[in-house]
């Protein structure tokens, strides 16, 4: 691919409808459909509190991130802001951790999609489906950011329609007007051991499970930097995040726990949404949910490729990754970053097949606490960035509520959750693995500093990498 004459300027090909739909569906992760049954089995109907707490945390984090992103829109998003507010080492570390998170998402989501397709066409092996899906989406991302936006627009629209239809059917059933099944009311919320059958500890445990579902809400601040009016889109996405979480998560999960017993045998294996459809005697419930999950994981895979490549591009532009990763093609797409991110994802698949199981388990576990670590860095960055922006005389057009007290509360809450995870056997290895990976990245700072002759331990100005 030929290089652009302006090798460090990304295109602004995302249209308003692309960014709008991305902001609406960006909070709808595939794990809402795949993993919600695990959280429900853990906490019972009180899983609603788990989603509420996790949702409130995301609302706070998005508000903090938006304050910084509106002031200085940047493809590197929170990594760039950590660079300026905390220090080069912080932006460097969290940028690479975030890139690694999405690199791991690529093969995991591709495998889920491939398994669904394999169940439809058993003659084609799973690995071939996975390869074809990944290469097809990589090719789409290489062409232009407009391709990513257009593809994601339709995938996101399908997710939104599916969830709204599910909520509508559930509401009709709860109201007692559904003619094809004898279900009504919300007694399931308390008739199987009460609303909180396993105690508040189970609610906290379920919240840790649900946190992964929300990862991706921040992508809109990365994508908006490639639109014509990033500030407008970021403000709109931030102001609407409350109703998006309320509708897509709280309302849909309420329908689930109101209609089916939380301790129903086989709930984890069948899935919560499919269980509701089967209860309502919807024909081909499994096929319907397979289609919805396939669309969702494809959307997530598409976004993973986009996000990983943009973070790698931003790291390169700031001197925190080799300069070759900042090259773009004629359509102003960071093609080297896209290819290297896909290559790294394929490498993890090779490790899965040929390395000892413990090695691959460490790689997967190392991404477990990255979401919370990213949120913690965003909160600390916003706490310090407000003062920096004021000192520079920059206009702060969107403000975090009750600054700095609410920011400190969020920092304290995230720290508390990480400590709790450290002492819970189910999440202990994730925190330790993520911590070891972060320490390993930090240890490369002196090497990068010597190689690039940079002072990575100082705060530096934000350089827009659009």
UniProtKB/Swiss-Prot annotation:
Induction: Induced by RpoS, but not in response to multiple stress conditions. GO terms for cellular component: membrane; plasma membrane. One of its GO terms (biological process) is gamma-aminobutyric acid transport. Keywords: Amino-acid transport, Cell inner membrane, Cell membrane, Membrane, Transmembrane, Transmembrane helix, Transport. Belongs to the amino acid-polyamine-organocation (APC) superfamily. Amino acid transporter (AAT) (TC 2.A.3.1) family. It is a multi-pass membrane protein. Monomer. It holds the Pfam family AA_permease. The lineage of its organism: Bacteria, Pseudomonadati, Pseudomonadota, Gammaproteobacteria, Enterobacterales. Pathway: Amino-acid degradation; 4-aminobutanoate degradation. It is found in: Cell inner membrane. Disulfide bonds: none annotated. GO terms for molecular function: gamma-aminobutyric acid transmembrane transporter activity; secondary active transmembrane transporter activity. InterPro entries: AA-permease/SLC12A_dom, Amino_acid_permease_CS, GABA_permease. Transporter for gamma-aminobutyrate (GABA). Transport is driven by the membrane potential. Can also transport a number of GABA analogs such as nipecotic acid or muscimol. Residues 118, 175-199, 268-286, 356-358, 424-428 are periplasmic. Uptake is stimulated by ammonium sulfate and abolished by 2,4-dinitrophenol. Is affected both topologically and kinetically by phospholipid composition of the membrane. In cells lacking phosphatidylethanolamine (PE), the N-terminal hairpin is inverted relative to the membrane and the rate of GABA transport is reduced by more than 99%. It catalyses: 4-aminobutanoate(in) + H(+)(in) = 4-aminobutanoate(out) + H(+)(out). The chain crosses the membrane at residues 21-41, 42-62, 97-117, 119-139, 154-174, 200-220, 247-267, 287-307, 335-355, 359-379, 403-423, 429-449. Residues 2-20, 63-96, 140-153, 221-246, 308-334, 380-402, 450-466 are cytoplasmic. This is Gamma-aminobutyric acid permease.
